[in-house]
Swiss-Prot record:
This is Acylphosphatase. The active site is at 30, 48. Its EC number is 3.6.1.7. Gene3D superfamilies: 3.30.70.100. Optimum pH is 4.7-5.7. The keyword Manganese does not apply. Pfam families: Acylphosphatase. It comes from Saccharolobus solfataricus (strain ATCC 35092 / DSM 1617 / JCM 11322 / P2). One of its GO terms (molecular function) is acylphosphatase activity.
């Protein structure tokens, strides 16, 4: 069994920024993202923006973030996700849980 070094574990941790467009406000989208994020051990937030989009900032293991991104692209049944812009960057460790705003 491989023993991971602190550096290797830290390198597996990432930050994801996503901006979700379409019918994503007033349809339970943020709660949907929060539920899946918590199940995947991801911390961060989902926030409604004035232009009708939703901003998601999430931190966790890269594999878990990729799974969350797939859920975001699907959205809950009442949502109509038209486009998701996203990027991955360096883990910052600034969140304690996953919030919605």
């Amino acid at each position: 069994m491989k023993k991971w070094s602190d550096t290797e574990v830290f390198e597996m941790l990432k930050r994801m920024y996503a901006r979700v467009y379409g019918l994503v406000q007033g349809v339970g989208f943020r709660k949907f993202v929060q539920i899946h994020a918590i199940r995947l051990g991801i911390k961060g937030y989902a926030k409604n923006l004035p232009d009708g989009s939703v901003e998601v900032v999430a931190e966790g293991y890269e594999e878990a973030l990729s799974k969350l991104l797939e859920r975001i692209k699907q959205g809950p049944p009442a949502a109509e996700v038209e486009k998701v812009d996203y990027s991955f960057s360096e883990y910052k460790g600034e969140f304690e849980d996953f919030e919605t705003y």
